[in-house]
């Protein structure tokens, strides 16, 4: 009898609460934010000049899955197969897609399988990830994933499914097991130069671009209020759609439905930051997660309803509401509490709707509606794209210039922030068949280093995995022998 009651309870929990933590809609919002960032960045020029891809972002690049271990190839193939062909970021039967399509595809598959979503939260005020575990909500979410995503009872009983806790996104960004994270980006970008065969280099470039998209997704979620305010229960478990498996918060659904793939602003100005981590969080408070948490409410981080009776003053109601806030910012401005039943808005100094509120019998109710979401999206979306464009520029800030004439090549590092502190330049000679062999290793220097080039060399390429004042980087460059 007890087991039967537990089964019924679990079914009710699933029916009421099942969802996943995916933040901005991958196929629409993440895709277009990534696209806008890439187009506004220097990536087109970098691909054309440093990697000899003359069409830049529109250069066809082939991904060969047989270059990967079988388990990784199967995982990547399955995730790429979920992409909608109408999205414009799927490869053809030959595995070829434009460079830009690979970046967008990486941003979409970054949170597959679904339990990866638990590692995309970051609370900059506490330096922590998602912490909403426990209780029936956690059970319901896990069972929902089991039924919806086919995770199976083995995963449920071994604890491998999403339990509403996760590591900080800043940690997941660097995790070796994240195949579309920073380590994958750096390693594959190296191989895109150092690989012996053209097919190997092309496949590595495709995977580097996929990883670039995954890195951008981590950053983009730092511009989603629920993801920087530890808000999973309210934002993601309160399913607004007709189905219990209608995924996503009200805000992300509003953004996807309002803007789609075409409605986001096209004018994007890249944001500059001193280090990679500073794009997300920094002591100056200008990381995207810092700025988002400080300026915007999410559905689950609003003030608690304030009790109002005949003896309650407006000041007392305000004090109660402010005292219930889980974060110091944004601050709750003065409220208009005289009129019963009318919807009001609290505004920021720049006339942006911060939240909606309404006095009803016995209390003041705080909530977010479409007008608040519209103001939030209007401010946040261009800012996210600007941070994304800046991050791409930051990752490709250093470049290796190769000037190959006759039997000599001058190899130099440009664009590094300060002195290059570690790493060596690996130089390669490419023959008429496109095969590359290691030529030599030299120390980086702004003045350049001359390298002897063997007869028959058609192209000289170089790569450096190093570190400068802004952190780790991979610099690449190649040039035909004149």
Q: Model-predicted segments: where are they?
A:
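Positively charged n-region of N-terminal signal peptides that target proteins for export
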Residues: 1-5, 18
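N-terminal, motif-rich segments that launch catalysis or mediate targeting to/interaction with membranes
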Residues: 21-214, 218-221, 225-371, 375-378, ...
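Bacterial N-terminal signal peptides
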Residues: 7-16
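Conserved, well-ordered alpha-helix/loop/beta-strand core segments that scaffold catalytic motifs
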Residues: 379-400
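Terminal low-complexity, poorly structured segments
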Residues: 5-8, 76
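Short, compositionally biased P/S/T/A/G/V-rich stretches that sit at domain boundaries
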Residues: 396-407, 482
């Amino acid at each position: 009898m007890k087991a039967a009651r537990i089964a019924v309870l679990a079914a009710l929990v699933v029916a009421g609460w099942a969802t996943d933590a995916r933040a901005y809609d991958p196929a629409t919002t993440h895709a277009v934010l990534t696209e806008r960032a890439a187009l506004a960045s220097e990536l087109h020029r970098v691909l054309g000049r440093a990697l000899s891809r003359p069409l830049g972002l529109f250069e066809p690049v082939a991904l060969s899955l047989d270059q990967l271990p079988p388990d990784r190839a199967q995982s990547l193939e399955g995730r790429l197969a979920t992409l909608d062909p109408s999205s414009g970021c799927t490869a053809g039967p030959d595995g070829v897609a434009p460079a830009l399509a690979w970046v967008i595809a990486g941003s979409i598959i970054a949170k597959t399988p679904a339990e990866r979503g638990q590692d995309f939260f970051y609370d900059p005020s506490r330096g922590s990830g998602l912490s909403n575990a426990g209780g029936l909500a956690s059970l319901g979410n896990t069972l929902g994933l089991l039924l919806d995503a086919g995770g199976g009872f083995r995963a449920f009983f071994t604890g491998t499914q999403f339990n509403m806790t996760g590591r900080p996104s800043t940690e997941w960004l660097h995790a070796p097991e994240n195949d579309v994270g920073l380590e994958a980006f750096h390693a594959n970008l190296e191989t895109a130069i150092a690989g012996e065969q053209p097919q190997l280099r092309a496949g590595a470039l495709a995977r580097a671009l996929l990883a670039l998209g995954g890195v951008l997704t981590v950053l983009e979620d730092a511009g989603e209020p629920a993801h920087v305010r530890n808000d999973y229960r309210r934002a993601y478990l309160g399913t607004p759609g007709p189905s219990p498996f209608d995924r996503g918060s009200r805000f992300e659904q509003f953004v996807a439905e309002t803007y789609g793939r075409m409605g986001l602003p096209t004018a994007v100005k890249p944001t500059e930051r001193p280090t990679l981590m500073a794009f997300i969080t920094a002591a100056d408070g200008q990381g995207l997660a810092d700025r988002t948490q400080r300026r915007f409410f999410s559905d689950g981080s609003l003030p608690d309803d304030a009790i109002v009776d005949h003896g309650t003053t407006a000041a007392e109601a305000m004090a109660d509401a402010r005292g219930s806030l889980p974060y110091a910012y944004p601050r709750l401005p003065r409220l208009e509490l005289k009129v019963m039943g009318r919807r009001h808005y609290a505004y920021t100094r720049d006339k942006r709707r911060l939240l909606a509120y309404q006095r009803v019998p016995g209390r003041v109710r705080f909530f977010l509606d479409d007008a608040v979401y519209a103001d939030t999206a209007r401010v946040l979306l261009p800012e996210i794209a600007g941070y994304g464009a800046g991050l791409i520029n930051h990752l490709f800030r250093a470049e290796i210039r190769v000037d190959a004439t006759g039997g000599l090549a001058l190899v130099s590092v440009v664009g590094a922030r300060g002195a290059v502190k570690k790493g060596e330049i690996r130089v390669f000679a490419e023959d008429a068949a496109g095969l590359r062999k290691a030529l030599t290793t030299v120390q980086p220097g702004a003045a350049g280093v001359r390298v002897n080039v063997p007869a028959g060399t058609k192209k000289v390429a170089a790569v450096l995995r190093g570190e400068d004042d802004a952190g780790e980087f991979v610099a690449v460059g190649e040039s035909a022998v004149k």
